[in-house]
Structures are given as structure tokens and as C-alpha cells.
């Protein structure tokens, strides 16, 4: 543990020491006065929230979780790019219905890597009708967002039946061939847009 020893040593805030918050970035986002689109990814899930600042703590205005997609009939993995896009689309749809059409992306301590899941959530929210400033070059290609890359990998792996069944066991358990993921994605996208 770091201890302050003299006037020259300054102890960073606890959340900065724990690697959870970049306060300089947070201040810039809060000064915009817009709600923040917060997207976080774990190995198996995507969480997207629209947050507003309050002195007592941030308030969640609208939220969406990739597990909500399963309730809507999604059979794919809840932690991949298509799930991230659909979660963002669901969040955006809910936000527009609540009258929250403007936001700013809060990427937290994540690096801005082209095609990352955070930007797939952002693209989903944009397609739902939200106004969020971003550069188009950072968002993944349409083929990656709809799962075509998973389909291509499944077709490549199908030559080795054992490896195919091991890699896509959850898909097959749920009754979805990985080769049909782009069509399944479009079906669920239409379902979300018609809510």
C-alpha cells in the first residue's frame, strides 16, 4: 500500500489506484452535460447503460443486458460482436422510447481498438436512432457485426467434425447451426426494431 510520506508525495484516488476510473476523462464526459453510454464486456455477457450524473452517485436511466436477447429468442453466444450490436440496438430502442436521443460514449479504461465490442454497442445505439458522436472508421465492418466471420470459421472447421462439435457445442445444443448465425441475427434485429 502506498503511504504519503511528505508534501511531495500525493496519493491517487482509491478508484484510480484500483484501476477503475480515469477521473480526467470522466470530468470531460460530465462537462458535456449529456447522458453517458456506458458499455462493459465480460467473457459471456455485454452490459450497456445510459447513465446520468448525480451528486450522490450516477443514475442509470436505461439499461440493456445481453441476457435479455436470450429471452427474445437469441441462440448465439451472449459475449460476441453480434450480441454486442443487438444489445446496443435494444438499449437505443429503449432510450429513444424514453425520449433520450442524445448521449456520449464512456469507454472507461478500455483502449479504443477498431472493431471492439464497445463500438459494436455504439453502432447498435446509433442504428436505433440515437445521436452519439463517433468516427465511422472505429466501428467494425458489417460482416463482423452480423456474425459472417463466425459463419466462415464454422464452414472452415466443419471439415474436422470433432473440432467443429467441440467449438460450437452451445450453438448446436440450442438448435442453431453456426452457419445460420447471420440470418438469425437479422431475424432478431427485425424483432428488436419492431418493439
From Swiss-Prot:
Signal peptide, first to last residue: none
This protein's UniProt keywords: Ribonucleoprotein, Ribosomal protein, RNA-binding, rRNA-binding
GO biological process, alphabetically ordered: ribosomal large subunit assembly; translation
Gene Ontology cellular-component annotations: cytosolic large ribosomal subunit
InterPro entries, sorted: Rbsml_uL18_euk
Keyword Ribosomal protein appears in the UniProt entry: yes
Keyword rRNA-binding found: yes
Pfam families according to UniProt: Ribosomal_L5e
GO MF annotation terms: 5S rRNA binding; structural constituent of ribosome
Function: This is one of the proteins that bind and probably mediate the attachment of the 5S RNA into the large ribosomal subunit, where it forms part of the central protuberance.
NCBIfam families found in the cross-reference section: PRK08569.1 (NF006342)
Family to which this protein belongs: Belongs to the universal ribosomal protein uL18 family.
Quaternary context: Part of the 50S ribosomal subunit. Contacts the 5S and 23S rRNAs.
Protein name: Large ribosomal subunit protein uL18
Organism: Methanococcus vannielii
Amino acid at each position: 500500500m502506498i503511504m504519503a510520506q511528505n508534501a511531495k508525495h500525493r496519493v491517487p484516488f482509491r478508484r484510480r489506484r484500483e484501476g477503475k476510473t480515469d477521473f480526467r476523462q470522466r470530468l470531460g464526459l460530465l462537462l458535456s452535460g449529456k447522458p453517458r453510454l456506458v458499455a462493459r464486456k465480460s467473457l459471456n455477457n455485454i452490459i450497456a447503460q445510459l447513465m446520468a450524473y448525480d451528486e450522490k452517485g450516477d443514475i442509470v436511466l436505461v439499461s440493456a443486458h445481453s441476457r435479455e436477447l436470450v429471452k427474445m429468442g437469441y441462440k448465439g453466444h451472449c459475449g460476441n460482436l453480434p450480441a454486442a450490436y443487438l444489445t446496443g440496438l435494444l438499449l437505443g430502442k429503449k432510450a429513444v422510447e424514453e425520449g433520450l436521443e442524445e448521449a456520449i460514449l464512456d469507454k472507461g479504461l478500455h483502449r479504443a481498438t477498431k472493431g471492439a465490442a464497445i463500438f459494436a454497442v455504439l453502432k447498435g445505439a446509433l442504428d436505433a436512432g440515437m445521436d452519439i458522436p463517433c468516427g465511422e472508421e472505429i466501428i467494425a465492418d458489417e460482416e463482423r457485426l452480423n456474425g459472417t466471420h463466425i459463419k466462415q470459421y464454422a464452414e472452415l472447421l466443419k471439415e474436422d467434425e470433432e473440432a467443429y462439435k467441440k467449438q460450437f457445442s452451445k450453438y448446436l445444443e440450442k438448435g442453431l447451426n453456426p452457419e445460420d448465425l447471420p440470418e438469425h441475427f437479422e431475424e432478431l434485429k427485425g424483432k428488436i426494431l419492431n418493439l
